[in-house]
């Protein structure tokens, strides 16, 4: 019996010591993403009430349906970025035909009401430029379907809203 205890003790000790390897510190890291060279082209199509610059590796596509319905005006577009499997949905509304406060409230609802439960943080960043346009950029953290949304307006005639979506499952750590 005494011999069995000694053999068992030696076996367990050998097992524990043989499986131990020196700890190697691993730095936190992220995937290296090679971004293409920054080159832009101008979207300035006749009949559209807005213009902007977008990357040369992206495509602007007219958006003609909204959840199976016809869009309320012909100025809704999508900016597709195939190399990143992403799309920016752009909707445009005329302030004169819509209540300005209602447009602002809807933009905030699209960010906060739909994402508050799953977002780990929502960071609103004011936007101002020299063309009398202002708005808000929202950076959303966590398991949200979209990480970036924004709206721009001149508060009298134009209201433009956008949201960026990636064709991928959202992961909290990405």
Regions found by a protein language model. Give the residues of each.
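Second-shell loop/turn segments in exported
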Residues: 88-97, 149, 173-174
């Amino acid at each position: 019996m005494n011999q069995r205890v000694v053999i068992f003790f030696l076996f367990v000790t050998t097992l524990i010591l043989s499986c131990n390897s020196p700890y190697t510190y691993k730095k936190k890291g992220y995937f290296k993403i090679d971004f293409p060279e920054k080159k832009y082209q101008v979207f300035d199509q006749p009949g559209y009430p807005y213009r902007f610059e977008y990357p040369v590796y992206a495509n602007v596509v007219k958006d003609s349906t909204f959840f199976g319905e016809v869009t309320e005006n012909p100025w809704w577009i999508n900016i597709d970025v195939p190399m990143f499997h992403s799309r920016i949905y752009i909707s445009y509304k005329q302030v004169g035909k819509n209540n300005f406060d209602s447009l602002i409230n809807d933009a905030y609802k699209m960010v906060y009401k739909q994402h508050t439960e799953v977002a780990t943080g929502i960071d609103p960043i004011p936007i101002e430029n020299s063309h009398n346009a202002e708005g808000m950029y929202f950076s959303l953290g966590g398991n949200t379907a979209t990480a970036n949304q924004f709206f721009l307006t001149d508060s009298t005639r134009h209201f433009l809203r956008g949201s960026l979506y990636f064709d991928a499952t959202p992961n909290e750590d990405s």
